[in-house]
Design a protein with these regions (language model features):
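Surface segments flanking catalytic/ligand-binding clefts of nucleic-acid enzymes
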Residues: 1-153
Length: 153
């Protein structure tokens, strides 16, 4: 880790109020988190924050209900009462790499099995996000609303 969140917030706060962009920098620093695994995940999270969706947990391990010792890490997780809403961002990097290695069909099969297992968790819903949703944030809003993600208070 190059810089802790606390040090980033401290550095931005030292800039003073009269510097151009300091308000935006403070907001960004407040939400900084190194857990996102791709630019798409980070951009989606930024849009969710900007558009007023409830904050979420990043890169959370959930366990396979069929094989309880088997963990699956999810991109986003919202806990809403006794329900879990899992968010997954689908970029192209993993698919492209699998295709280059001649393993695309296996990767797609494994992903379907993973999603099938996660969907068996009690009171669980899965929402898949993609670059299209980021280019048209109203699509992102509709998906999150239908999935049951609450707005921030």
């Amino acid at each position: 880790q190059l810089l802790s969140k606390e040090h980033l917030v401290e550095a931005v706060n030292k800039l003073g109020l009269n510097r151009r962009g300091v308000v935006t920098a403070r907001r960004v620093a407040r939400y900084a988190d190194g857990l996102s695994e791709s630019g798409g995940e980070s951009k989606a999270r930024a849009l969710m924050i900007e558009r007023g969706w409830q904050t979420l947990e990043l890169q959370i391990e959930l366990f396979d209900p069929v094989e309880p010792g088997r963990p699956y890490r999810v991109d986003y997780l919202w806990r809403v009462g006794d329900r879990l809403i899992i968010g997954e961002f689908d970029g192209f990097v993993k698919s492209e790499k699998a295709a280059e290695e001649g393993k695309l069909a296996k990767a797609q099969f494994d992903e379907r099995q993973r999603e099938s297992r996660l969907s068996l968790l009690d009171n669980c819903k899965i929402v898949r996000l993609c670059w299209d949703d980021l280019r048209d944030p109203t699509k992102l809003d509709r998906k999150l609303k239908v999935a049951g993600v609450p707005r921030a208070c």
